[in-house]
Amino acid sequence: MRPWRCVSMAKAPAAPSSTQPDPVSYEAALEELEQLVGRIESGQLPLDQMLAGYQRGAVLLNFCRARLEAVQDQIKVLDEGALQPWVQE
């Protein structure tokens, strides 16, 4: 008997690089993240691209969270250290 070995029949398209730069804004990161989630959820990505997309998504999510925390901290400073409850007018 011959031992099994994995042979790739076709090369998958290049996966997004995990060294992509941070987005320029929260809005750009959110838009890229939404598009990425759509591609992943479609089920049409090869496994390698799905993994790379997941990794990029984690980077984008961390970027968005950091920006939101920074804005929240700035609001606390403007509100004298206490985050005020939102009251819709």
From Swiss-Prot:
Short name of one Pfam family: Exonuc_VII_S
InterPro entries: Exonuc_VII_S, Exonuc_VII_ssu_sf
Source domain of life: Bacteria
Record's keyword terms, sorted: Cytoplasm, Exonuclease, Hydrolase, Nuclease
EC number(s) from the headed UniProt entry: 3.1.11.6
Top class in the EC scheme: hydrolase
Annotated region described as Disordered, given as residue ranges: 1-23
One Gene Ontology cellular component: exodeoxyribonuclease VII complex
Annotated compartments: Cytoplasm
Tagged with keyword Nuclease: yes
Catalytic activity from the UniProt record: Exonucleolytic cleavage in either 5'- to 3'- or 3'- to 5'-direction to yield nucleoside 5'-phosphates
Biological process according to GO: DNA catabolic process
TM stretches of this protein: none
Any one GO MF annotation of this record: exodeoxyribonuclease VII activity
Subunit details: Heterooligomer composed of large and small subunits.
Protein role: Bidirectionally degrades single-stranded DNA into large acid-insoluble oligonucleotides, which are then degraded further into small acid-soluble oligonucleotides.
Assigned protein family: Belongs to the XseB family.
PANTHER family: EXODEOXYRIBONUCLEASE 7 SMALL SUBUNIT
Protein name per Swiss-Prot or TrEMBL: Exodeoxyribonuclease 7 small subunit
Organism from which the protein derives: Acidovorax sp. (strain JS42)
Gene it is expressed from: xseB
